Amino acid sequence: MSLEGIGFGYRERAPYASNPAFSRGRLVPEAESPTRTPFQRDRDRIIHSTAFRRLKHKTQVFIAHEGDHYRTRLTHTIEVAQIARALARALRLDEDLAEAVALVHDFGHTPFGHTGEDALNERMKNFGGFDHNAQSLRIVTKLEHRYADFDGLNLSWETLEGLVKHNGPLLGPYAAHPDIPVPQPILDFNARYDLELSRFASLEAQCAAIADDIAYNAHDIDDGLRAGLLTLESLDEVPLAKRLLDIVRTRYPNLDPVRTGHELVRRQITIMVEDLIEEAQRRLASARPGTMEDVHNQPRALVGFSDAMRAEEKVLKRFLFKNLYFHESVVVRRHAADRIVQDLFDACFTDPSLMPDEWRLGCEALDKAALARRVADYLAGMTDNYAVREHRRLFDRTPDLA
């Protein structure tokens, strides 16, 4: 792989990159900024939103109050954005769009991570279900109330498309998960503003999606080591990790375990990023897209790992599921978190007056499905600590997350 100029942002934009000068615009038309591109404005709106600040107090893997140094949704999001920008720069794409998609991709996550999402989806199964990606879309198109002229953030078409389809098309022959119905909130919005759900998203969105994988593959190891749920010796079971650890141990034979873990994590990020850039360049050379439209019309993603790295990543993910995500201590906390979210849903659905004024007003006029969605919107926006406090306020006994 040639590294000439790859880390610098002044190289000419690739012809297949998203170009803000040709943005498809916004649902509510706005005058253009004289100082910022549409994608830069999207990024800035995302950063200044309430939903972005709430990520600080939402769980990644470990419950937020377990320690000050474990990753939250916010720190994870910042790490994803950094990797996404690096990938976009290397491939001569629009860094601002890649960053915007990365920054917004986790907006819809509930308190307590995927446990909270599963709990809400269970309670919402008769009312259209709950999906964090669809919830992210609801937040940026409806639930944020910052602007006088519109609800949401009125993001550009390209950022919305990247948010909804960063993991692949949702419909058609190339759908990433054809057996899973498209969440109703996405279908409802798509009827108003066509995001072309059967086509691949931009390369910038693809960079954001794979940056998410790179970030959590590495940083969950870091947090797992810090928590004592993983050990450097156990990571020798993972071929990729062992190969990198052998390099570290050979070069630094007397290095302490903490720094050894950090050296592993940073090397893993580097090797995955370099593999992805090289593989993306190979796919681009083969597909030879000449425009953004050519990217959308491809039969596969053009940004992805090589077959060899993908195989190694699958082994790593299996290891993390077995030894970290389903570790006994994590599972116990997940059961407690599940109880908290389901209890809160049941209470607020039965008696909407338990919710704050801005959420309960008008509930008496809603049918059951609309009321359930209102309650889900309220609960999904909670931070971990707020959910615990509300449960303690409403119930005599709250499950212990400590």
Curated annotation (Swiss-Prot):
PROSITE patterns: HD
Taxonomic classification: Bacteria, Pseudomonadati, Pseudomonadota, Alphaproteobacteria, Hyphomicrobiales
Keyword tags: Hydrolase
Pfam entry (one): HD
GO MF: dGTPase activity
Organism, as annotated: Brucella suis (strain ATCC 23445 / NCTC 10510)
Family: Belongs to the dGTPase family. Type 2 subfamily.
NCBIfam families with a match to the protein in the record: dGTP_triPase, HDIG, PRK01286.1-1, PRK01286.1-3
Protein name as it appears in the record: Deoxyguanosinetriphosphate triphosphohydrolase-like protein
Ranges for domain HD: 73-217
Any one biological process term the GO annotation gives: dGTP catabolic process
HAMAP family documented for this protein: dGTPase_type2 (MF_01212)
